[in-house]
Amino acid sequence: MQTWQQRVDKALGHYLPDEKTTPVELHQAMRYSVLDGGKRVRPFLVYAAGEAMQADATALDVTACAVELIHAYSLIHDDLPAMDDDDLRRGKPTCHRAFSEATAILAGDALQALTFHLLAYHLPDSIPAEQRLSMLDMLAVASGSRGMAGGQAIDLASVGQQLSLAELENMHIHKTGALIRASVKMGAMCRPGVDADLLQKLDHYAKCIGLAFQIQDDILDEIADTETLGKTQGADRALNKPTYPALLGLEDAKEMAMELYTDAIQSLTDFDQRADPLRWLAQYIVERGN
């Protein structure tokens, strides 16, 4: 994991615009929001899925950067006053607090654009063109109205509402789960001619851990402190957002996360020890903060 952290951080530093180039403040905001912070869970999932499939190393670096840039863009916009209005992210002032609201909006836009530039021009030719196009489409869908953006829209519309479990799951399958599923599948697709059956099993794994990730996030928002979280503790409760602990109770939410973890692990039965990083990441997702 440490090697993967070093690889993705080095690649991100390379692909992000130099903060001394014009427009300086925009480039500073982009680098500020991406570098020196974050758990890098999505890039790690790219690398872990690639490891399980013996994928191309260069393609994995590019793809790991792409999913982290999309994630960073989404966090910048989620933190804006018009959305979650948060002051802290990764233990430091949010982008719009460190710079300005206008610069934060532009930084998010620019990170999203850079994502698709990387996938369009920096994936190696060893990956078939059709497969590269499929990866582009996959990330576009995962980040748009049928993915993250759609999930955030549902989230904003659900403030103060009582959602059913099915409605809450649907929201987070889009808001959180879509990018996690794309990260795993795109990592696997960094192998030329990826096996469709194995890809389907990885997608099921990713769907399970995507929901488990959000449940654990909701749990930590209730029980962890601001310093541990790196963002404002209790923010979801303060905004009267629907969460798994609020709907199910804390203990039942923990049990649901563990059931999803077990389901995720079972979906990896046909994979050998090269899938152990995926198994470890699933465990990390449900145990982090404990």
Q: Residue locations for each model-derived region?
A:
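Double-stranded RNA-binding/processing signature
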Residues: M1
